[in-house]
């Protein structure tokens, strides 16, 4: 009868590897002092580098050749790290030796191909590795006699699991053993269901990360479950490790391309499973389908997105098909200026070929220079990218891979149009009429066939899904690759920010007549009244008191007494008032901490001008660094540091602003960064209710999808509606576009627009609001839809160009700004409404563009 024990699990893995042309290694050939299988290493060197051995023999002057070589190799590994030696080789007495050969892109060079085929992969079971005791490892994988990975296996049918394997590494594998300090890249603990991995053994402090496929295996398909772990298959759940990852070519790619040196000596950055998976799947589909595709990668916060982008950029540079390089250049575009340099540093560190990474900080000439200098990966921000478009006609015959970081915020339409201009085919330099000019303008806004687009986003908007997502047979749009928020939380890479959510409700008694005043538009007056109450010194004073009481009662002892909080406000004025209230109450109560404030620009209040720098008494660029200091515990923000801001000590958020959609997810997600001492988070919300927050998060918890394509009739419907208001005539639309084309004087443009503004002002107030809303919707919708319309319609383009300028001149909001003269706040109080864990199902679906 079959015994389902640990040995049978080892048998299964070994059998598969031996069938894959691994060598069955002999534990007796392993030199414990050198940490090498000396026989296999020397066999590899004799086969691939006999001339170097001969030269080394001459320089040795009769001494023990193998002994000296092995000792030199050991010392270099301990000095430089195994990864560097595998990638760059080792020099012995001036003779250079390679220790591994990567797979060449083709077989043009017989010697290179032969050397690659001469790599010796071996598997050793029950390896006794120590000179101090008789401990053994279940399994070790070697490449050319050098140990790469160790394995501890557990069979769940024998009553043990991956947890026991991890404990075995922590308790029974001394981190001081030579094999574990310098001579291996990673250590795998696994059972039949789960795989965990560590790059450094540190005894009880050893950290193991999941190396699992995820229940959806990276797929964005809608019918798949999402979360941590591995999906059920027709084999053992963890079979992918030996059936795919440990296969020869896969292993070479992994160690030579997807493992990078870490920040500390002899440490490495090992690609997580989803990072390895997305890079490989994208390269495979590009090799299969060629240039011109669009791919959406929805990877949650905590996915290591910057590293994924760096690995992908480096992989695309070297990608070839039929012995031809697929892309001439890889452009990496980010919408966060402060990350431009950071991302460049990561890509440079990850790229195996040095000197091929450049950054655009000025304009088009610098881009041309970068390409002529052989820069294959070029990094820029959205803010700089439009300036490099005009003087680069030579680029338009090249093929591009365009990697877009944080595509959710950059894909309203205009950004993709700028990219399309860069990669578009060159136009003849000739005289052209207005119709030809507009036709070219429309074409320039569309995606170009000589570029592939790779869009990364944790929270893709409907437009992003339609532009870059894959369309299913049911017409829905889904991401090409998905690493869900649910999986990131379950794997411990981010915290669940909705696990402790507190909502407050406020009650106010006001004396006011504005709701019955005909001079005030009712809905707008109500909105102003709510803002008046929210920003009133009484309410800010009361909310500040609640925040500080909560912080010093429950929060400040978290993270071993280092916890910090962020206050989300809805305006610079509100941020300023909160900052003053915090300063006063912190001083009054004798609390030992301070607050910082963050907002852009300046605000003038009661004749005095304030800025972030003047209030904090430091340049605004210093604010994030100052917030790291222990005495600064509160950061009060107004539309700043709500995206892309990583501060692991941030534990609690106080929200006094309406949040919805992607902005809600991004803002609250500032809390999700992990820290060894951070066990939980807390949100205290004065404005939003629990259901509103759940609605915002639902689309991004598991799979995200768009229910169908946009209705291409919508811009035509909006155009008809707008025409019916008779704010402009068709003759005026034509004349305005001709004036723009002919570079008419500014006064002529204003004269044309003023006539339309006069007609707009004569409309009923409700009709004014309708026209304004429809005009904004048209501009936003057209910017997006023009990229995917399968035809040209110049009339849509003409109206778009008119409305972009007209809407800037339309008068808005005639209600007096100062309502304090007709409103008085008499009473104000706060009550806790709810304290709960907000539970997500991930069942929501986004809707396509709709006309207003």
Give the location of each predicted region.
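Inter-Walker segment of RecA-like/P-loop motor cores
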Residues: 348-390
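Interdomain helical connector at the RecA1-RecA2 junction of SF1/SF2 helicase-like NTPases
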Residues: 227-235, 463-562, 579
